[in-house]
Design a protein with these regions (language model features):
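Phosphate/Mg2+-binding loops and adjacent switch elements
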Residues: 186-187, 193-243
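Well-ordered alpha-helical segments embedded in enzymatic catalytic cores
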Residues: 108-111, 179-183, 211
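Alpha-helix C-cap/termination motif
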Residues: 115-119, 190, 218
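Preference for solvent-exposed, low-hydrophobicity sequence contexts
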Residues: 1-93, 97, 111, 141, ...
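Short acidic, glycine/serine/threonine-rich loops at helix termini
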Residues: 107-108, 135-140, 208-209, 236-238
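Glycine-rich phosphate-binding P-loop
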Residues: 93-118
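Nucleotide-state-sensitive switch-loop elements of NTP-binding domains
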Residues: 76-98, 120, 124-195, 203
Length: 369
């Protein structure tokens, strides 16, 4: 990584596109409400943009990786309406952040979570986008408890990870909603006073609108934050139980990502969760099995799709039924009723779920069932 020094004036913003690292050498800066500690190095993930806002003049050392970038802009990169909405939230809030792709949903969720953490001591975070999950592998949704502000929600550790079986809610709406329902049940059991739900980005068309209405019926947010997006039936539902709806603008400096880049991000994530994996032979008679999609055939027929170069993305759980790990089913022996699964999961396997993504052991998506 090349290293450069930057001076940022009070009230301005240093925009960093990862992969990069940032170290504040003097002054005070924050990212989405998280104050950065001096002389600590913060790692920025690839294909993500991080706004380091100058609360005072600050100097920083920046290291940039391949394809990364850094630039200083005048003023605050996030709108005044964002900070105003976040600052008006009270203890006991359940916040749902809604918007299309590349509108800043996760950035807003980070700002809200950090604001609630600083004021009230913590919040639960739900990442409900199975295509761009930052708490868990692609094709899953997850929840984490945040005890202190963070510059990147991916730093939080998920206490619940549940499989959806596909990388978009549009590919299997019922499987997605069932997973969200289960996730909310686990989150409510924690007794978290504040909840922030970062929704998926499918918002256009009648089916998307219906899904979002059903989604908020499950979450029951006290506050709906809608970024450059208005779905009347969702607004009416939230207001129907006394919820507050805030419409905010999409910031002008959001990083836009193509479908190819999103696919690359998923591939890197699969690889990370399959790191140090090995092949495990699992007798199917020893585990509970589930096919996540009602539109897919039962497992004996489904597993016939497994090929040497295209395994089936599989989800495994042990004693904790709320924490699933991913694997790739690489072989099915019908006669012996065993499967070979490439996975990093350690310990006994009690449950296996099958989705619809065909995946190589290197983490490349090669098709969908």
């Amino acid at each position: 990584m090349s290293s450069t020094s930057h001076r940022v004036g009070e009230g301005d913003t240093l925009l960093l596109d990862g992969p990069a690292s940032l170290r504040i050498t003097s002054g005070r800066a924050s990212i989405l409400g998280c104050t950065l500690k001096p002389n600590k190095s913060y790692l920025m993930r690839p294909h993500r943009r991080y706004p380091a806002y100058a609360e005072t003049d600050f100097h920083a050392e920046v290291r940039l990786g391949e394809g990364a970038g850094a630039k200083i802009i005048k003023g605050d990169s996030i709108g005044e309406d964002w900070r105003d909405v976040a600052n008006r939230l009270q203890n006991g809030s359940t916040v749902a952040v809604m918007g299309g792709s590349d509108t800043g949903k996760t950035a807003f969720a980070t700002l809200v979570a950090n604001t609630l953490c600083k004021r009230y001591g913590g919040t639960a975070i739900l990442c409900l986008d199975p295509g761009q999950s930052y708490l868990s592998p692609p094709s899953t949704i997850a929840a984490a408890l945040l005890r202190e502000p963070t510059y990147d929600l991916a730093q939080a550790k998920a206490f619940t990870t549940l499989p959806v079986g596909s990388t978009s809610a549009s590919q299997d709406e019922e499987a997605y909603l069932r997973a969200v329902q289960r996730l909310m049940e686990h989150v409510r059991k924690t007794g978290a006073a504040n909840i922030v739900a970062d929704l998926d980005g499918w918002v256009e068309g009648g089916e998307a609108e219906t899904l979002k209405e059903r989604l908020v019926q499950i979450i029951k947010p006290s506050h709906l934050i809608s970024i450059d997006c208005t779905i009347e039936r969702v607004v009416e539902a939230v207001m129907g139980w006394g919820g507050v709806v805030n419409l905010v603008k999409r910031p002008s400096h959001i990083l836009e990502r193509s479908s190819g880049v999103r696919r690359e991000i998923r591939s890197m994530s699969y690889s990370r969760y399959l790191k140090n994996a090995s092949v495990r032979t699992i007798p199917l008679g020893w585990v509970d099995m589930e096919v996540l999609s009602e539109s897919l055939p039962e497992y004996p027929t489904l597993l016939n799709n497994v090929k040497p170069d295209a395994g089936l993305l599989t989800y495994l759980a042990g004693e904790d039924e709320a924490q699933y790990h991913i694997g790739v089913t690489t072989k099915y022996d019908r006669g012996r009723r065993v499967v070979k699964i490439y996975t990093a999961m350690a310990g006994p396997v009690k449950r296996i779920a099958f989705g619809r993504v065909l995946l190589t052991v290197e983490g490349d998506e090669v098709g969908y069932l």
